[in-house]
Every structure is written in C-alpha cells, then in structure tokens.
Amino acid sequence: MPNIKSAAKRVEVTRKRTMRNTRIKSALKTTIRKFEEALKNASHDEARLKLRNAIRAIDKAVTKGVLHKNTASRKKSRLTKRFNKLTG
C-alpha cells in the first residue's frame, strides 16, 4: 500500500491502463481468431472481410499504444500472407 499520494495515484492509473490494454488485446485476439476460422472454412469472401477487420483492429491497437508499430506490421504481414496462400 503506497504511503505517498502521488504513488497511490500511479497505482490507480496503472490499474486502469492495464485493464484497458487487456480489453483491447482480447478484442484483437478475438478478431484474429475469427479470421483464422474463416480461413479454415475456405470462405474467400468471408476471409477477406475478417482480414480487413483484423487489420483494422491491429491498427487501432497501435493508435492506442497497446502494440508497437513493428509488431503490428509483422502481424498484418503474416495474416495477409496466410490469406494470399489460401487464395493462390
């Protein structure tokens, strides 16, 4: 338990940011999982839509400071590569 008021505030701010980051990362993982399921079903149009949603979610995570831009670029590249492999 912090004794100094500023330290107590930092604990609270950290807790709030952690919750926010966890929520954003969880939503990101869900969108990526939905894209992977669409790939397994070999539905080309659905997979394209899910890929667009996944890339949008990744970009939003970068904007909010949850992911580093290079990490996001790597994730987008891998997802796009998997989509292109399916479509030929």
UniProtKB/Swiss-Prot annotation:
Task: Tell me a GO cellular component.
Answer: small ribosomal subunit
Q: Where is the composition biased (Basic residues)?
A: 71-88
Which segment of the chain is annotated as a signal peptide?
none
Q: Where is this region: Disordered?
A: 69-88
MF-aspect GO terms: small ribosomal subunit rRNA binding; structural constituent of ribosome
In terms of domain of life, where is this protein from? Bacteria
**Which GO BP terms sit in this record?**
translation
Checking InterPro entries in the record gives: Ribosomal_bS20, Ribosomal_bS20_sf
> Does the record's keyword annotation contain Methyltransferase?
no
Keyword terms, alphabetized: Ribonucleoprotein, Ribosomal protein, RNA-binding, rRNA-binding
Q: Which NCBIfam families does the UniProt entry name for this protein?
A: S20
- Indicate the family of this protein: Belongs to the bacterial ribosomal protein bS20 family.
Q: What does this protein do?
A: Binds directly to 16S ribosomal RNA.
HAMAP family linked: Ribosomal_bS20
- Designated name of the protein: Small ribosomal subunit protein bS20
Q: Which organism is it from?
A: Pelotomaculum thermopropionicum (strain DSM 13744 / JCM 10971 / SI)
The major lineage groups are: Bacteria, Bacillati, Bacillota, Clostridia, Eubacteriales
